Each structure stands twice: as C-alpha cells, then as structure tokens.
Regions:
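Acidic, low-complexity intrinsically disordered tails
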Residues: 134-153
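Residue-level recognition of short, structured coil/turn motifs
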Residues: 114, 152, 233-234
Length: 282
C-alpha cells in the first residue's frame, strides 16, 4: 500500500511548509541570512569522459572473457527464474564470476519477471492547510484561476528526475505544494532518460517541465531534454530547474533555454509565483 512512504512524504511536506513560513528556523536559509553570497569552490567533473572510460572498461571485459561460458551462465540464470527451480542469487554470482555485467545479469532476470514500475502519487492538503488564509498563498491561487480562465484549463507541470539521480524528496515536496496551489501535477518515474521525459511532457500536454537535479547531471541531461522537446515540436513547454545547481552553471542553462532556476532555500510559494507569472506573460 506504500503507507510508510506516503507518511514520510507527508512529514517532509509539513516540514517544508513550516520552513517556508519561518516557523521552523534554519539559520542562514530562512533566518539570519548572510548579506553576501559566499563563493564556493566547485570541483567540475567531466562526466562524459567518465562515462566513456566506463564504457571502454566494459568493452574490454567483454572482449577478454569467455563469452560462450558467460552466456551459458546467463541462460542458466534465466532458466532458474523461469522455472523457479534453483537459487537465483547463487546463479547470479556464478554469472558474475564469468564477468557478466550487472546490466546483463539484470536483463536475464528482467526477461522473466519484467521491470517494476512505481506509481507516483501526490499528497494533497498539506500546504493548503498550512497556508490557510495566508495572503501570499491566496494571491497565487487567484493567478492560477486567472490562467485557467485565459487558457481553459489549469497550469500543468511535469516534475521529473533525470538519469541516476534518485534523490526525490524535493521533487515530491514540490509536487505536493504545487497541487495544493492549484496546478495539475504529473510526477515522472525515477531514472528517466531525457528523451522519455520529453515524450511524457508531450503526451500529458503540460505547460511546464520542472527538473529536480541533485546529482550534478544538469549540464549533460538538460540540453538533451530541450533538444528532444524541439524534435517533438514542444518548444512552447517552459523548462525550469531546481535543486543543487552551482551558480556558475546558471548562465549555461539560461542560454540553452531554461527559463528559471531555483536553488537550495528557495521558498516554494515564491517559485510557484514566478512560474505562474512566466505562463501569464506568454
């Protein structure tokens, strides 16, 4: 039923609402903020080079192993999965001993069992209850209603994670808050490719794609997403980013078409207000 997961997400949303309201104090974020931005040295890693190195290593392993024996062990693993007779873990270890890769081992198992697809659900009411009768909250609600009158439907946002970034707390909090503000919210599955996310955005007919980035892949994956949208005639979709993104990278993202970037400590109501303003000005 996913009850523990939903309780954790509800707790995170309540905590974030309290932080945004200043009820939960975080020194330097919502109270006693520094007057000047401190420049932080960033280690830039060429992830394209790292990826190519890993691919070269995998190709070397495949070229130097006993491929016939390796394929037999992978076939044995798949047969055990299909018949239920034997030890799956033991068979996977035997395949690994013959230098089968994790991808190949996973594929053998997936051929029988398929791949799990998580259902992403958004909570409702947490932010609405926290901001009951709040002027700022009501003001944004009015802007959402104005957009609905203008466009014939509510603003729709797709909140996504790209690549191997599995840190989804921030994305789930954003989805919960924006739903309470009045947006229609879709949440993409974890570990999507940029091409898959672009197709989802087109299929769901969204106005905004919100990319939550916590794993420093924004300079690699966001350009691919934007190129994919162009190929699908989705240039009208507003692309924004949030999360841990160095300020030095803001110009790069803006130049390729990202309309807004929200760093750590951003008040969610401020972000929602900025986004609805972008849509109303289009």
């Amino acid at each position: 039923a996913g009850i523990p997961k939903s309780r954790i997400e509800e707790s995170a949303a309540k905590k974030q609402a309290a932080i945004d309201q200043g009820l939960e104090v975080i020194v330097g974020v919502n109270k006693y903020k520094p007057h000047q931005k401190e420049k932080v040295e960033i280690l830039n890693v060429d992830n394209i080079s790292v990826r190519n190195t890993q691919i070269d290593r995998l190709n070397h392993i495949k070229a130097t192993r006993d491929n016939k024996l390796c394929k037999k062990k992978l076939k044995d693993l798949e047969d055990i999965c299909r018949t239920g007779s034997g030890n799956i873990l033991g068979s996977a270890v035997e395949a690994a001993k013959q230098r089968a890769t994790l991808g190949e081992i996973s594929a053998s198992i997936e051929n029988v069992f398929g791949r799990y697809k998580a259902n992403s659900k958004t909570l409702s009411g947490v932010y609405k209850n926290a901001y009951e009768n709040d002027e700022g909250f009501l003001k944004i609600n009015k802007k959402v209603e104005l957009f609905e009158q203008k466009e014939g439907r509510r603003p729709r946002i797709l909140v996504i994670k790209l690549g191997q970034d599995g840190h989804d707390r921030g994305a789930k909090v954003i989805a919960t808050a924006f739903a309470d503000i009045g947006f229609d919210v879709d949440v993409g599955p974890l570990f999507q490719t940029p091409e898959e996310a672009a197709q989802d955005a087109i299929d769901n007919d969204v106005h905004i794609i919100g990319i939550s980035s916590q794993a420093a892949a924004h300079k690699t994956l966001v350009p691919i997403l934007i190129d994919s949208l162009k190929k699908l005639n989705g240039e009208e979709i507003v692309v924004v980013c949030g999360g841990v993104i160095p300020r030095e990278d803001y110009d790069f993202l803006n130049k390729i078409g990202v309309k807004a970037i929200f760093g750590p400590g951003t008040n969610i109501l401020d972000a929602a207000n900025d986004l609805i303003d972008i849509l109303l000005k289009k």
